[in-house]
C-alpha cells in the first residue's frame, strides 16, 4: 500500500462535515447561517444545544482519530502518521465537500491527540472545560489547550509527537485569527456548554 494513500484517506475523512450534516438532519439547522457561521463543533453546540453539538464534537474527534489509527496500524512510520494527521485536519478546515469552507480543526485535532497520547487528550479536555466554564470563551479554551498539549506531547511522547501537536496548534491558531482579534477587542462570542 503506497504511503501517500494514508494522507489522502485522512483528507477525505477529515472533509466529512459532521458539524453541518448532524444539525441539518436532526434540527433542520444550517450552521453556516447561524451563530458564527463556522462549520465546527463549537458553533453546533452554540446553535443546537449540548446534545446535538456533543454528537458533532464526538464525530469530528473520531474523524481525526481513525485515519491516524489506521496509519499507525498499517504503516507505523512516524512521518507518514504526521502527514496523515495534518492532512486530516486540513480536510476538516478546507473540506472538498463544502467548497473548502470548513471548521477550525480543534475537535479533529483532539481526536488525533487522543490517538497518539491519551493522557494528553485528557489534559486537553480538562483544560478546555475549565477555561470555557470560567470564561465562556470556547476559542480561548481551545487555543490554550492546544499549546498545553503540544508541550505535554513533547514531554510524554518525544520530539516527533510534540512537533506534530505544535504544527496542529499553529494551524488552528491561524484559523482562529478572527476570534483572537475579537478576544482582544472584548467582542468574542460566548458559549454556554449546558444550555442553548
Swiss-Prot record:
- Pathway recorded for this protein: Lipid metabolism; phospholipid metabolism
Alphabetically list the UniProt keywords.
Cell inner membrane, Cell membrane, Lipid biosynthesis, Lipid metabolism, Membrane, Phospholipid biosynthesis, Phospholipid metabolism, Transferase, Transmembrane, Transmembrane helix
Q: Name one GO biological process term.
A: phospholipid biosynthetic process
Keyword Cell division (UniProt): no
* Tree of life domain: Bacteria
The protein's location, in the record's own words, is: Cell inner membrane
Q: What top-tier enzyme class does this entry carry?
A: transferase
> Where do transmembrane segments lie in this chain?
2-22, 52-72, 80-100, 112-132, 137-156
**One GO term describing the cellular component:** plasma membrane
Bilayer disposition of the protein: Multi-pass membrane protein
Instruction: Give EC number(s), comma-separated.
Output: 2.3.1.275
Short name of one Pfam family:
G3P_acyltransf
Q: Which reaction does this chain catalyze?
A: an acyl phosphate + sn-glycerol 3-phosphate = a 1-acyl-sn-glycero-3-phosphate + phosphate
- Report if keyword Cell division is assigned: no
- Give one GO term, molecular function aspect: acyl-phosphate glycerol-3-phosphate acyltransferase activity
Identify its protein family.
Belongs to the PlsY family.
Complex and partners: Probably interacts with PlsX.
Question: What does it do?
Answer: Catalyzes the transfer of an acyl group from acyl-phosphate (acyl-PO(4)) to glycerol-3-phosphate (G3P) to form lysophosphatidic acid (LPA). This enzyme utilizes acyl-phosphate as fatty acyl donor, but not acyl-CoA or acyl-ACP.
Q: What is this protein called?
A: Glycerol-3-phosphate acyltransferase 2
Amino acid at each position: 500500500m503506497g504511503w501517500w494513500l494514508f494522507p489522502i484517506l485522512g483528507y477525505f475523512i477529515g472533509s466529512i462535515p459532521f458539524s453541518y450534516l448532524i444539525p441539518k438532519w436532526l434540527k433542520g439547522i444550517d450552521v453556516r447561517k447561524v451563530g458564527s457561521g463556522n462549520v465546527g463543533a463549537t458553533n453546533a453546540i452554540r446553535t443546537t444545544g449540548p446534545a446535538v453539538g456533543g454528537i458533532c464534537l464526538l464525530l469530528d474527534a473520531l474523524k481525526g482519530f481513525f485515519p491516524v489509527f489506521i496509519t499507525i496500524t498499517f504503516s507505523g512510520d512516524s512521518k507518514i502518521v504526521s502527514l496523515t494527521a495534518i492532512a486530516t485536519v486540513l480536510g476538516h478546515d478546507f473540506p472538498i465537500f463544502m467548497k473548502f469552507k470548513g471548521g477550525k480543526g480543534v475537535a479533529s485535532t483532539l481526536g488525533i491527540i487522543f490517538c497518539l497520547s491519551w493522557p494528553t487528550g485528557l489534559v486537553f479536555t480538562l483544560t478546555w472545560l475549565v477555561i470555557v466554564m470560567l470564561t465562556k470563551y470556547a476559542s480561548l479554551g481551545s487555543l490554550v489547550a492546544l499549546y498545553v498539549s503540544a508541550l505535554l506531547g513533547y514531554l510524554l511522547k518525544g520530539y516527533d509527537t510534540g512537533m506534530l501537536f505544535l504544527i496542529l496548534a499553529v494551524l488552528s491558531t491561524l484559523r482562529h485569527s478572527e476570534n483572537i482579534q475579537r478576544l482582544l477587542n472584548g467582542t468574542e462570542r460566548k458559549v454556554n456548554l449546558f444550555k442553548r
